[in-house]
Amino acid sequence: MVIKAQSPAGFAEEYIIESIWNSRFPPGSILPAERELSELIGVTRTTLREVLQRLARDGWLTIQHGKPTKVNNFWETSGLSILETLARLDHDSVPQLIDNLLSVRTNISSIFIRRAIRTYPDKAREVLETANEVEDQAEAYTRLDYSIFRGLAFASGNPIYGLILNGLKGLYTRVGRHYFSNPEARRLAQGFYQQLLNILHTKQYELIVDSVRDYGRRSGEIWHGMQVSMPTELLPAR
């Protein structure tokens, strides 16, 4: 087990999460007692207690007063906040994880983008027009792409879509820095934003879903072509 965290709390969190992932503390099992675990990891009980509370909030553990701390099946109890952690723990699974992320983005965005453009065109226009001033480099496009999808999610009038995008931000932006290093990806994205603006201006709302799905398909093709050059440390440890 190689742990790169620098603070005692970060080290303890990494240790416990990796132990759960590697089945040293398998789902359904009971964690060692606080004193034993703090000595095993090499941190104070106060630090360990804070870490355990944080991991419980993220769905890794169940803590009940007077009962031993139980390890959860995190797939069933955790939220989107653990995506970065999962990608870091198992680099081999990153391509599939990102494929799933792109698929989810396409499926939900075809709904909220259509709703935003049809129902709240002024808000949608304001979001999309930010694409007109973006600098042609990876970091700028990463921020822009996330901002546009998130902005349209909130502009749809259903804030739940925006909250989903909030939960995806960490992995979304880290992947984006690699993806948008490809000029073809930046050109495709800019064309997509302008296409949505044109649909908004012409009120050809029936074209929205196909436009979003086509962008999802073509961006997926670019991404698949870039996987061979994906950084080994796509997601650094905390």
Curated annotation (Swiss-Prot):
Q: Which UniProt keywords apply?
A: Activator, Cytoplasm, DNA-binding, Fatty acid metabolism, Lipid metabolism, Repressor, Transcription, Transcription regulation
Domain of life from the UniProt record: Bacteria
Q: What GO MF annotations does this protein's record show?
A: DNA binding; DNA-binding transcription factor activity; fatty-acyl-CoA binding
The entry describes its oligomerization and partners as: Homodimer.
Organism this protein belongs to: Erwinia tasmaniensis (strain DSM 17950 / CFBP 7177 / CIP 109463 / NCPPB 4357 / Et1/99)
CDD domains membership: WHTH_GntR
Q: What is this protein called?
A: Fatty acid metabolism regulator protein
Main location per the UniProt record: cytoplasm
